[in-house]
Amino acid sequence: RICVAYEGMERFFPADKIILTGNPVRPSLTQNLISRDEAARKMGLNPAKKIVLIIGGSLGARSLNESVMSSLALIRASKDIQFVWQTGKFYIEEMKRRLAESETVNNLFPTDFLQDMDIAYAASDLVISRAGAGTISELSLLGKAVILVPSPNVAEDHQTKNAMALAIKDAAVHIPDSKVSKELFPAAIAIVNDVSRLTLLRENILRLGIHDSAVIIAREVLALAGHPIRTNSLSNIKSVYFIGVGCIVIS
C-alpha cells in the first residue's frame, strides 16, 4: 500500500495501491491556537500590516535566499508588508553581511531558525516554502495560503509532484526553483495584497487537510500485519514505528 497526502497521486503511483491518509503532524502545531494578531505581536510585528513568512528549512534554501537578496528594492518598496525570513543556519551570517552592505530594508526580518513555528504560521498571511510532504500537511491543516518552490535536489523530483497536486486544485501557487529570482516576490506581493485570492487559497488548501492521519496509517499497518482494529480507539497499541523517505509506503 502507498499512503499519500493528497488526491491525484494515481498519476505517479499504481492506483490500486494508493490510500489517502495525509501525513501525521506534531499535535502541538494544531493545539492551543492563537489569533493572528496575538501571534504577530509575539513576534514583534505590526498586526496592522501584512506578513509574509519565508521558510527554507532549518538548513536554509540557497535559491530562496538569493531571491530575497535580488528583490530587496521590491521588498523595501512594499512598506505595508512585513517579511519574516528564515535563512537557515548555514546562510544567516552571509545574508546579514550582505544586507549590511545594502540600503536599509526596515520591513525584512532575517533569522536563522524559528523555534515556535505554530506562532510563525499563525502570524503569517502568506507562506513561501519548499514543498516537502510534512510541511504541506502542516499548511493544509492550518489553512495557510502558500507559494510552493519545490527543491530540485530531492529523489525523483517528488517535491514538484507535491506542489503540482496542490496547484491543480488552486490550493497553492507553484513556482519552479529555476524561476524564483524573477517571479517569486512579484507573485508574493500581488497575492498578499489580493484578499479574494488569499481567501481562495486558504479555503482550498484547508479542504485537503486530514486531521487523523496517524490513526488512519496505524490502522492500515495493523490490518496488513493481520491485527485489524475494529474500534475507534487505538489506546491498546503501545508502539507503531514508521520508517519512510518522502512518503509512507507500506509493502
Regions found by a protein language model. Name each.
Residues 117-159:
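A donor-sugar binding/catalytic signature common to diverse glycosyltransferases
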Residues 211-230:
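C-terminal alpha-helical cap of glycosyltransferases
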Residues 173-179, 191-195:
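Conserved acidic donor-binding segment of nucleotide-sugar-dependent glycosyltransferases
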Residues 5-14, 94-96, 135-136, 156-163:
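Short, glycine/polar-rich helix-capping loops at beta-to-alpha or helix-loop-helix junctions
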Residues 41, 197-211:
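A short, well-ordered alpha-helix in the C-terminal region of glycosyltransferases
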Residues 34-127, 160-163, 168, 175-185:
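Donor-nucleotide binding loops and adjacent catalytic segments primarily
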Residues 1-40:
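Active-site-proximal region of nucleotide-activated glycan assembly enzymes
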Residues 230-251:
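ATP-dependent carboxylate-amine ligase
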